């Protein structure tokens, strides 16, 4: 294994969530990263990484199509769970939570947790296959995932 020389420790967390996403059964998409041995690949690249399992998300979250935000307040509850889970890692210098999810809306909870620790000067690199920047519309029910970037800014 290559020598770990950047002093960073990564904490791999899966976010089993679909409340903010459009498609059902996407809550287990992060399993594909585990099946592809992401942890082993990161270790082979010299990273110190720990598989911390799943972020605890309640199973009772609502599922509905009531405008303007699908399944609300489910996404808000999930974002709070994410923030509580990653807060201890963010408070340790050199520890980085690496969140894997099929639900783009987790960027909101992650950004909020980062801002609680680091203040307003948080910068996020958001990589996705589409824009996720739709603004809420009172007459249309949209997923929180579709509005993720809009809500995070």
Locate each region found by the language model.
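Conserved alpha-helical scaffold segments that buttress catalytic/binding sites
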Residues: 2-153
